[in-house]
């Protein structure tokens, strides 16, 4: 979502005095929009180190909001979690202290691998997509003659390629492909996916 779209959303929310809860975990590298909390006093933004920062294992995230909401969430957190792991906090601190270098590295991976995905989609007659913004995952439509869950399981068992079947998102005949990995791994995975598609 770009800034203009967010400002339209804020105007609608203000008319009815509504909060806007914005999941900013997948913020795009190439279309940086402002955070909802910078546009609206009733904006609530969540983010984490999992996606854009590529540190999913430590499970560290945050909520940004006005003071009233922050106090409610802090009280709730006290009842659900004593504290985060010390190691997790140390890794999170290190990542955030080196934020720009890490984001630049990840931006480069996204750009290069998205170009590989573009090439594969252009060549693969049984695949199509709405090209994603520069984020870490894509949602690809596949021309297959079986339930997508079965397709994904056979792809994993027969070729060692893992995709998330689209029925998990109420979209049959689609798969989610995470493409921010080593380029050679991505190329090999896409080749194997094409091999399996050609057999279907």
Language-model regions, residue ranges each:
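Active-site pre-lysine segment of PLP-dependent enzymes
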Residues: 1-55
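A generic structural signal for well-ordered alpha-helical segments
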Residues: 13, 121-122, 155-156
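Helix C-cap/helix->beta junction micro-motif
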Residues: 15-16, 124, 159, 200
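Conserved core segment of the aminotransferase class I/II
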Residues: 44-111, 118
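Conserved glycine-rich beta-strand-loop-beta hairpin in the small C-terminal domain of fold type I
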Residues: 93, 109-118, 128-142, 173
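A short linear hydrophobic-aromatic micro-motif
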Residues: 125-129, 161-166
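PLP-dependent enzyme catalytic core of the Aspartate aminotransferase-like
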Residues: 145-146, 153-163, 169-200
